[in-house]
């Protein structure tokens, strides 16, 4: 099971009765703790009174490919926890089949990453520690086209519907320096997401 144990204050148990009824039905152990103890268990300034101990969920690239994905996000050297979590959440909202993190990316289970996914990390397959070159080659071999999200690429609206409808892995580079040149050599196409407002750039 995903949730191993819950730590909660008495106030939280009173505020979220449905949550703890479900925990009891699932035979999840609940430990009542004081406010100071709960605050020591979390790094947030104002914790909500409940801390869950959960299993870390890992997926294998082979399993992802075997499931014939239509949309995959591949994060290359992403270092900022907030950005990583936001991409996970956006990928989930877009109906992505998986998110793959390269071996030089931020820890997926960094507390800031987990919080910024707002739960998406628990129901979207995530592959961690992937070698970029090997992963791209494996995806290509499975018939998945590789697009790099790059400001200097072809404008997204210029791509045909047929092209966008094919199984695709979107590669996103580091926040500060973008892509390694050798990574761009492996992709099928560099694509720029247009910015219509006054924003200077997107996060990734």
What is the predicted role of each segment?
Residues 1-204:
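Post-transcriptional modification and biogenesis factors for structured RNAs
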């Amino acid at each position: 099971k995903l949730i191993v144990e819950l730590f909660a204050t008495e106030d939280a148990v009173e505020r979220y009765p449905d949550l703890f009824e479900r925990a009891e039905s699932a035979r999840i152990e609940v430990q009542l703790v004081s406010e100071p103890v709960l605050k020591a268990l979390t790094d947030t300034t104002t914790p909500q009174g409940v801390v869950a101990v959960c299993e870390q969920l890992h997926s294998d690239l082979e399993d992802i490919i075997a499931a014939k994905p239509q949309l995959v996000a591949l994060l290359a050297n992403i270092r900022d926890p907030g950005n990583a979590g936001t991409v996970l959440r956006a990928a989930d909202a877009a109906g992505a089949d998986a998110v793959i993190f390269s071996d030089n990316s931020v820890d997926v289970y960094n507390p800031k990453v987990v919080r910024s996914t707002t739960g998406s990390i628990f129901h979207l397959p995530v592959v961690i520690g992937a070698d970029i070159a090997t992963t791209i080659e494996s995806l290509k071999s499975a018939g998945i086209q590789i697009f790099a999200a790059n400001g200097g690429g072809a404008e997204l609206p210029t791509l045909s519907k047929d092209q966008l409808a094919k199984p695709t892995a979107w590669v996103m580079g580091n926040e500060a320096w973008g892509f390694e040149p050798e990574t761009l050599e492996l992709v099928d196409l560099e694509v720029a997401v247009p910015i219509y407002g006054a924003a200077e750039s997107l996060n990734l």
